[in-house]
Amino acid sequence: MSESLSGKWALVTGASAGIGRATVLALVEAGAKVLATGRRKAELETLAKQCSAQAVEVIAGDLNDAAFVAELAARAGNVDIMVSNAGVLTYAPLMDMTFDETEEMFRTNVLASYRVTHAVAKAMMERRRGHIIVMTSIAAREVYRLGVIYCATKHALSAIARGLRIELQDYGIKVTEIAPGMVDTDIRATSNHPRVLEALKVRKFSPLTPQEVADAVVYAARAERNCCPDLVELRPLGSA
């Protein structure tokens, strides 16, 4: 029997759109209450209105802002599940990437993710329970053309997730990586580089949907108390 999420309190970052938004909806459907955060307040409020009364609370802000993260951690309180999902992506050849684009990806995908996870994990350690779910990527285990910097950020985030799993297990805290392949989200459409557009045209498979990834999050969150799904990899059929 899998664990019920009824009455569980979850925090989802990057919830304004894509995987984060789908994850909020999936967790609510499974019975959890969710604190959803992202940069776009209007989208978060629209998301909350789609859910049953008081199932979703929203707080908009930038995870790169230390003061906001402190406020978010205090608001999250005794959170049972944290889904660290916020991220950015720029597809381009390595030598065409600007330093600003590179810095933004490392700052958001690695440092901001770690900042909020660190704050929430501290509270979980005091209670000696909790589940941290980190959205990494197939890119955490590969390096591919047009996405080298993104791969580097996901390699770093995966290493942090694995380290947290080792250090937090003695406190009864689970850490799971969800590692999807290409997903049909806004983040995938952020580059107009000709080589990127051409590569997308010739692909021979359909990307995963945000809902498919969200279902994997719920699957991991519902694992039996003594079972920790360390890594859940998802690939579009035909993409291997």
PLM region spans:
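Conserved glycine-rich cofactor-binding loop
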Residues: 9, 16-17
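Active-site helix of classical SDR
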Residues: 20, 117, 153
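Conserved glycine-rich Rossmann-like NAD(P)H-binding loop of the short-chain dehydrogenase/reductase
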Residues: 32-46
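Substrate-binding pocket helix/loop in short-chain dehydrogenase/reductase
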Residues: 93-94, 101-106
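Alpha-helical segment proximal to the catalytic Tyr-Lys
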Residues: 122, 166-169
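Residue(s) in the substrate-gating loop at a strand-loop-helix junction
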Residues: 137
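C-terminal helical subdomain
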Residues: 173, 177-178, 198-240
